[in-house]
A protein has these predicted regions:
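Glycine-rich FAD pyrophosphate-binding loop
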Residues: 1-16
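A structural preference for short, hydrophobic beta-strand core positions in alpha/beta folds
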Residues: 3, 68, 100, 137-140
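Glycine-rich active-site loop/strand segments that organize a redox cofactor
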Residues: 12, 16-47
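Flavin (FAD/FMN) cofactor-binding and adjacent substrate-gating region
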Residues: 27-34, 56-130
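A non-catalytic, amphipathic alpha-helix used as a structural packing/dimerization or gating element
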Residues: 43-57, 86
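Helical element adjacent to the flavin cofactor pocket in flavoenzyme catalytic cores
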Residues: 89-94, 111-162, 166-167
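Short glycine-rich, flexible loops that bind phosphorylated cofactors or substrates
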Residues: 171-173
Length: 173
């Protein structure tokens, strides 16, 4: 396995993250339930729950010292408690441990918040450093295209049996 990194490892979103590992991705569950249906929404939830568990398992199995800890995650509003309540209802219907609250760990008051229990936080750069020590990484290698097992980069092409995209923004349309 190799990693192609367009810049330097950890220089993008990883360095500027909130360090939360969470199934909370803005107000998505009510909309997803309504627009995509319950089955697809449940699949989305399931994938996110598996990812959360994978982080925990990887940290334990590889003994990665990255300050990994279980904690709650909050999504809040300063103006619309009803929207937050609808999101909580959808999340609970989809099997997520979530509750409406006005109490958070934030240093300011909110009109409403979703508390997602059993989420996690960690030091992402320590985590990434431990992973990077076990991988072959080509930094400053921008992927410009992918076609059926062939990856095009600004430094040449790579053949691959499988390709995983792990970027903050899509690298192509």
């Amino acid at each position: 396995m190799i990693v192609l990194e367009g810049n330097r490892v950890g220089s993008g979103q990883t360095a500027g993250t909130t360090a939360k590992i969470t199934i909370s991705h803005n107000l998505i569950y009510e909309k997803l339930f309504r627009e995509a249906g319950e089955e697809k929404a449940r699949k989305y939830v399931s994938a996110n729950k598996r990812a959360l568990k994978m982080y925990s398992r990887l940290v334990q199995e590889e003994q990665i010292d990255c300050d990994f800890r279980e904690c709650s995650s909050y999504l809040y509003s300063l103006t619309d408690a009803e929207q937050i309540k609808r999101e909580v209802e959808a999340a609970v219907r989809l099997g997520i441990e979530a509750e409406f609250t006005t109490k958070t760990e934030l240093p300011f008051s909110v009109i409403g918040s979703i508390c997602y229990q059993k989420q996690a936080a960690f030091h992402p750069l320590l985590f990434l450093k431990a992973l990077a020590e076990q991988l072959v990484i080509y930094e400053h290698t921008k992927v410009t295209g992918v076609e059926e097992g062939k990856i095009y980069t600004d430094h040449g092409n790579v053949l691959a049996d499988a390709v995983v995209f792990a970027s903050h923004h899509p690298i192509m349309n």
